[in-house]
Amino acid sequence: MEPDSHERIISATRAMSAGAERIFDLIADPSAQPSWDGNNNLASAAPGQRVRQVGDVFKTTLTGGMVRENHVVEFIEGSKIAWCPAEPGKQPPGHLWRWQLEPINSTLTNVTHTYDWTALTDSKRLDKARSTTPEMLRESMDRLAMLAQASGG
């Protein structure tokens, strides 16, 4: 039985004791992503790939050694970024990672992390998509918050 579309969108929200600019910089810099990845899925990403706009593509290496090209599909500096991962040279198979930041004040930010696989049709990826939980998203958020707070927020 296929899940309903609402079951294919998983999200978690939390407040972080850091400014939105600092948090966003850690998300938009792919080389920082492995340090806060709560899924333990990312091994590395080369420096110098800071996302600046929709259409950018950044590469990450997964813990299993595979490379992913991440196609940026939503971008508002400091407040929203989303990308669709794909195998090199291929079209994204239909899942998306999104981060949205809402400043509460200069040192407190509400952050929402979403995994959306409503458009995923690749049967080889469905089990992995189904296994992604809000707790996994929260783990990434907790690690990101620690890094942002430690660096002066």
Where are these regions (language model features)?
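Hydrophobic-ligand-binding modules of eukaryotic lipid transfer/binding families
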Residues: 1-15, 94, 104, 135-138, ...
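Hydrophobic ligand-binding cavity/cleft-lining segments
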Residues: 1-49
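Short, hydrophobic/aromatic-enriched beta-strand segments in well-ordered soluble domains
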Residues: 14, 112-113
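Hydrophobic-ligand binding "helix-grip"
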Residues: 34-35, 61-110, 116-118, 146
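A conserved amphipathic terminal alpha-helix motif
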Residues: 116-153
